[in-house]
């Protein structure tokens, strides 16, 4: 989106992503090292911190990445826009707004809360202009999305679907395109700095409802969807560190997990991608891959 606006965009990752998008400069660097970042970009106007270290390493990796990126922003005089999530709030009651306190007690939630608290302190001290976007679970085509690789390929192949947590609790879902749009809007608007913003997202849907919408888009009428179950979730967590961390955030899928994005929508005039388009875009990725492999 930035390249389409004619901006010079440098994408930094630990291994070259080969995105193949015209206008992007792809460079390799270690985001946890200030020196490494300075070798690939000696100056910048805006830094978008979209780092996503392995889920089970957040406690160790996030402090290093955040410290390095923040120092890099201060060295170059750049503004900083952080891509985050809702983990920092921890278990809660009611619809989440940006005013909710950050009171997470599990490792990954504490890690994300600390990133914001430290950067907010730099902002308030006048050392850095920073803002943070907070999205709910992404609905997109990849292995980390609950509605991605775990659902669509199985529907296409006629296989049963098993999902972690309750499949009948309302949940807010976020499209990554809406994350990108908000991050860009925040960087271009002085009203954004010094506070977090929730990503514009559609009305909540249960996991069962989302699977039904995906199945309808695929033209699949006969399918099975069920929860994994608490016992099996715990057993899987013994052997899989990612599932073990997901289990620690189980509260997100055992009761309503609903987010208000009213502030961002009203302040910046944004709205979420229409839900039917979210589903169409999701399915399109898998249909394309299926056609290539078929």
Where are the regions that the model predicts?
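NAD(P)H-binding glycine-rich loop region in Rossmannoid oxidoreductase-like domains
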Residues: 14-75
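Conserved catalytic-site region of short-chain dehydrogenase/reductase
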Residues: 56, 86-96, 138-145
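Substrate-binding strand-loop-helix patch
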Residues: 142, 170-177, 199-217, 226-234, ...
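Substrate-positioning beta->alpha
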Residues: 143-150, 164-187, 194-198
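Terminal hydrophobic/aromatic helix or amphipathic segment near a protein terminus
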Residues: 212-258, 291-292
């Amino acid at each position: 989106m930035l390249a389409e606006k004619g901006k010079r965009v440098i994408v930094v990752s630990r291994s070259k992503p080969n995105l193949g998008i015209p206008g992007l400069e792809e460079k390799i660097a270690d985001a946890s090292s200030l020196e490494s970042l300075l070798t690939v970009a000696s100056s910048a106007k805006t830094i978008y911190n979209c780092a996503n270290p392995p889920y089970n390493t957040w406690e160790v990796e996030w402090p290093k990445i955040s410290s390095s990126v923040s120092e890099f922003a201060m060295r170059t005089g750049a503004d900083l826009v952080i891509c985050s999530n809702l983990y920092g709030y921890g278990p809660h009651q009611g619809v989440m707004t940006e005013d909710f306190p950050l009171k997470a007690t599990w490792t990954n939630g504490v890690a994300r809360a600390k990133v914001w608290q430290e950067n907010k302190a730099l902002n308030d001290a006048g050392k850095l202009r920073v803002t943070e976007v907070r999205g709910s679970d992404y609905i997109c085509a990849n292995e980390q999305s609950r509605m991605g690789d775990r659902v669509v390929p199985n529907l296409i192949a006629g296989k049963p679907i098993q999902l972690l947590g309750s499949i009948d609790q309302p949940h807010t879902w976020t499209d990554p395109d809406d994350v990108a749009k908000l991050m860009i809007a925040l960087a271009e608007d002085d009203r954004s700095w010094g506070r977090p913003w929730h990503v514009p997202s559609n009305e909540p849907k249960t996991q069962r409802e989302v699977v039904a919408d995906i199945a309808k888009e695929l033209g699949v009428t006969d399918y099975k969807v069920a929860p994994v179950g608490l016992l099996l979730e715990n057993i899987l967590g013994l052997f899989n560190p990612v599932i073990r961390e997901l289990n620690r955030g189980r509260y997100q899928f055992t009761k309503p997990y609903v987010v208000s994005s009213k502030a961002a929508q009203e302040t910046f005039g944004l709205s979420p991608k229409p839900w039917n388009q979210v589903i169409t875009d999701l399915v399109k990725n898998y249909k394309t891959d299926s056609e290539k492999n078929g």
